[in-house]
Amino acid sequence: MTRRGKIVCTLGPATQRDDLVRALVEAGMDVARMNFSHGDYDDHKVAYERVRVASDATGRAVGVLADLQGPKIRLGRFASGATHWAEGETVRITVGACEGSHDRVSTTYKRLAQDAVAGDRVLVDDGKVALVVDAVEGDDVVCTVVEGGPVSDNKGISLPGMNVTAPALSEKDIEDLTFALNLGVDMVALSFVRSPADVELVHEVMDRIGRRVPVIAKLEKPEAIDNLEAIVLAFDAVMVARGDLGVELPLEEVPLVQKRAIQMARENAKPVIVATQMLDSMIENSRPTRAEASDVANAVLDGADALMLSGETSVGKYPLAAVRTMSRIICAVEENSTAAPPLTHIPRTKRGVISYAARDIGERLDAKALVAFTQSGDTVRRLARLHTPLPLLAFTAWPEVRSQLAMTWGTETFIVPKMQSTDGMIRQVDKSLLELARYKRGDLVVIVAGAPPGTVGSTNLIHVHRIGEDDV
């Protein structure tokens, strides 16, 4: 069977070969993620070109995602490169410039002394080392180590519960976004989203450049969970980024947040990616743990559009095996059922009602496929959220829409000429599906489109059609 859940792979040092990137595409990579927290522009340009070449060579749609670093807060550098903070020690984190020593080190967040208050927690290196703020003395935040461990240059800091006032887009992010858009990426992920207004800052940069692409909100902060519905509505897609989320929130809350975010995204026809440590042990080992296999399976059962591999493919020893393993797990779950938790949302929009009706007609008539003509991808996403067992085929004249739909559940997208009439649409369906050799004359399909063609948001037509028959 054809896999319906999509796979996002992070590119990095482990994937710096043309043949390996092509192998990843052939194994099931649907979206290639470029992580702008690492690498330089030359690295990203080469990676981008590798993906485009592999996509063209294999005929598979592969989207390219630029993941912006966001206002990531880090320690500065230590004179010795590293040290070990023991429980009970006092350490100072300063917003001033200094050469780091064992008990005093700088931070990239220059408002820390203004935002911190006694009792705040400071977590270093994804929570491996924990501090509590005792006092603020000038530029220094004085802390006590409550959970000790090794620390080294540029380790990340999380500040759960602190009212952090860093901007949603740093200067680096603006430069990276400009580069990525000019390069031609298909979508952008914004890190550490806190408010629905954060997307407006990204759109301002996009509008200056003259190119808008979908923006994915990475859910990593408690504020994002508090504003979840508004963020889902404002952004084009969401990513449940469980790494930082698991540091900022109690661990036991993360699975429930994941399920809630997936359901809310589906209710609003927004793609949702589940990320972080899906097959983490495969960074070092050729096989995942049983718990990781269950984690992947449960994300599929929750209704996620796509699952993401991070270190497994960017720096891991077995990137190709990781993709193949994830694909096998997804397929095994889908062989049992493509169903997801039922949607409670009752559509009240024209496109929402039409998508439900097309799904119902197709399933009751035992159609061979649902076919949707789309200019923006919206109608296809509304169909995809229903998790129909019927194949979902998207026809578009826009290559960027084909690439963007690569992260949407169950969607196979084809580039077709711009249509001038509904009769032309139906003839194109016959031509394309017969060329696939998976369909034959007389097979029943349900077509969803807008009439007259050529207007975004004009979906108003459902046509029940037998391939090759003159019913136009």
From Swiss-Prot:
Catalyses which reaction? pyruvate + ATP = phosphoenolpyruvate + ADP + H(+)
Q: Where is this site: Transition state stabilizer?
A: 218
Q: Which residues bind K(+)?
A: 35, 37, 67
Q: Which residues carry this modification: Phosphoserine?
A: 37
- PROSITE patterns per record: PYRUVATE_KINASE
- Pathway(s) annotated for this protein in UniProt: Carbohydrate degradation; glycolysis; pyruvate from D-glyceraldehyde 3-phosphate: step 5/5
Which residues make up the binding site for ATP? 35-38, 74, 155
Instruction: Determine if Metal-binding is one of this entry's keywords.
Output: yes
Enzyme Commission code? 2.7.1.40
Report the GO terms under cellular component. cytoplasm; cytosol; plasma membrane
Which of this chain's residues are annotated to bind substrate? 33, 243-244, 276
Residues noted as binding Mg(2+) in the record, renumbered to the chain: 220, 244
One GO BP on record is: glycolytic process
Q: What is the effect of changing residue 37 to A?
A: Partial loss of phosphorylation. Decrease in activity
Swiss-Prot/TrEMBL cofactor(s): Mg(2+); K(+)
Gene3D superfamilies according to UniProt: Phosphoenolpyruvate-binding domains (3.20.20.60), PK beta-barrel domain-like (2.40.33.10), Pyruvate kinase, C-terminal domain (3.40.1380.20)
Alphabetic keyword roster: ATP-binding, Glycolysis, Kinase, Magnesium, Metal-binding, Nucleotide-binding, Phosphoprotein, Potassium, Pyruvate, Transferase
The molecular function terms in GO held by this entry are:
ATP binding; kinase activity; magnesium ion binding; potassium ion binding; pyruvate kinase activity
Give the free-text PTM comment from the record. Phosphorylated by PknJ. Dephosphorylated by PstP.
UniProt key word Acyltransferase: no
Family to which the UniProt record says this protein belongs: Belongs to the pyruvate kinase family.
Subunit relationships:
Homotetramer.
Q: Report the protein name in the record.
A: Pyruvate kinase
The protein's gene is named pyk
